[in-house]
Amino acid sequence: MHLADPTRLLASVNADPEFRLAARYWNATLSLESPSRALRVEIADGRVATCRESAAGRPATITVVASDDGWAQFLAPMPRPFYQDLLGGCVQHHGFQVAGDILSLSAYYQASARLFAVMRALRAASEEAS
């Protein structure tokens, strides 16, 4: 599943004031993986430095793995119950797996939630354009 256009995601997240505030001082690599693809987001000093398609299973600070259907539900413009929040719903009820530096994820959870909100908005815009 195509999670997001890397170029548009990089530009949109870096232009988002809420993300910039929540992510200040954050240094991490996120690997967002489905069975067919992975999206690698590298964050340096609170800004997305690079965003690109990648092979799954590469080392990252935080790795989130889900089925294609799970990602589609999670990134829907209005996610149904228990798909609105990564840890509160998806991990407990829908088989998402989160691995890596959980303390970093916890400290910057609002930034990661904002990243996913931007991904939802981009996905909705691309679906409307199709």
Where are these regions (language model features)?
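Feature captures hydrophobic
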Residues: 1-130
